[in-house]
Structures are given as structure tokens and as C-alpha cells.
């Protein structure tokens, strides 16, 4: 807006078109920033909805695994691997700045809940040996679970 003040007080010929151009540029920039923010919010909502839908679909199975006391065989293992992959995807989008800190911390507290079970932790450790989870580690989960 300082540029408009300089143009107005300069008395230069054609200053009206300079004012219009400056205003149009400023408004265009504001629109661009606002649209980008809205697009990011929409992406967050889509990711949040998708991640929660996928978690909800496996929640009962995860609870059954945690409540059980038998060895984890192929079917429960598959559910856990799907869950760990979901957690890794969430982490990837968190690192990229698309998942809010509070949401990520809440999800980490849920991960800690499951990973406290020794049998689930054994499957986690075996999966982490493959190093295919975008750098997500137990240490990261535990640290981020404590953040609000």
C-alpha cells in the first residue's frame, strides 16, 4: 500500500493505471495466498478423513489382537502390517506439513497404546528391520506422543 501512496503523491502522468496495476497485483497475490491456504486445508481434511476411515475399518481387529494372548499368526500379522503402513503414511504427510501437530500427537498416543503390547511390538520390530516406513521409529512415536 506504500507503493500506492508514492504513486498518488508523485503526480506522474498515467498514475491511475499504475495504481490500478498495483492494486490488481496486490489483490491477485492475496487471492493466491488465500486459495493456497484453502487447498491445503482441503487436503488436510481429505487426508484426515481417509486415514480415520482406514483406521476405523481395522480398529476392532487391532483391539482383538491386543486383547488376545495367543501367538500372532498370518491374519493378525497382516492387520498389524496394514496398521503400521497406515501409521507410516500419516507420518510422511505429517513431515511434509499436511497433518497438524496436535492430530499427529494424538495418533502417536494411539500407536503407543498398541506398541505397549509385547506381541505387537515384536511384529513392529520385525517390520522396522525392512526400513520401509519413511523413517518412522518407535522413538519418534514416543516423543511425538508426549507433545500437545
Annotated model-derived regions:
Residues 78-95:
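Short, hydrophobic/amphipathic alpha-helical patches that form generic packing surfaces
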Amino acid at each position: 500500500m506504500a507503493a500506492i501512496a508514492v504513486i498518488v503523491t508523485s503526480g506522474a502522468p498515467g498514475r491511475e493505471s499504475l495504481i490500478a496495476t498495483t492494486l490488481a497485483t496486490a489483490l491477485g497475490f492475496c487471492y493466491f495466498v488465500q486459495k493456497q491456504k484453502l487447498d491445503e486445508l482441503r487436503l488436510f481434511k481429505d487426508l484426515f478423513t481417509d486415514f480415520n476411515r482406514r483406521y476405523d475399518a481395522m480398529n476392532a481387529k487391532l483391539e482383538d489382537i491386543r486383547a488376545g494372548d495367543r501367538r500372532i499368526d498370518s491374519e493378525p500379522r497382516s492387520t498389524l502390517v496394514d496398521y503400521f503402513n497406515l501409521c507410516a503414511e500419516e507420518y510422511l504427510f505429517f513431515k511434509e506439513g499436511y497433518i497438524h501437530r496436535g492430530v499427529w500427537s494424538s495418533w502417536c498416543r494411539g500407536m503407543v497404546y498398541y506398541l505397549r503390547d509385547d506381541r505387537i511390538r515384536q511384529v513392529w520390530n520385525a517390520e522396522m528391520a525392512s526400513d520401509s516406513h519413511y523413517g518412522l521409529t518407535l522413538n519418534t512415536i514416543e516423543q511425538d506422543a508426549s507433545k500437545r
